[in-house]
Amino acid sequence: MLVVESLALGIDRFKSLIVEKVKEILHEKGIDIRGVYERSDAKVRTLEGMERVKGIIGDEFDTNVEIVENGVHYMIDVVNGQKTGFFLDQKYNRLAMQKLCKDKRVLDCFTHMGTFALNAGIAGAKEVTGLDISEYAVEQARANAKLNGLENTVHFKCANVLDELPKLNEAGEKYDVVILDPPAFTKSREATKNAIKGYREINMKCEHEQLAR
């Protein structure tokens, strides 16, 4: 399956050509895709006067897909997941996490579909807790934990991280590894100061004398 996203008018004009060329290149490498799904539904498209588009390009096909990355299995929801369904740019960061988590107690903040948490679990972490404000993302994460046989080690909770961290501190919880991968707090220059304040607040709440040990 090929999932595409176009956020700029210049790219949008050549979208069909780009998709066909990508399919040709993949075919030459022995990779034949079963279908193309477009996730050009980001709000930012409206800034260039473009409609938000989402759906299958071409013939109908099954959009459910299972992938394996760094030894971890995931069921990907390209229809309802964030952006194109999976953050491929974090592949090597997730792999690096595996080297830090064996026999450790891990807290994964802003876990989304649990990718960092699951990498910690597959690497032999003693206990992993993932936090995310999205109930849908947490449901996905739990399903992927079960898919990997990690449901007894890797647990997920639907919670606002900024609210949950003080509660964990008050309860005296301590973690060997704390993962912070927050979403973008701003997409414009005007909100930069508030974004910096938010990032600082998150890191302050995870100071070594509090959550991390």
Language model features: what each stretch is:
Residues 14-86:
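Non-catalytic substrate-recognition/targeting regions of SAM-dependent transferases
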Residues 5-9:
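Structural motif
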Residues 54-213:
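Rossmann-like S-adenosyl-L-methionine
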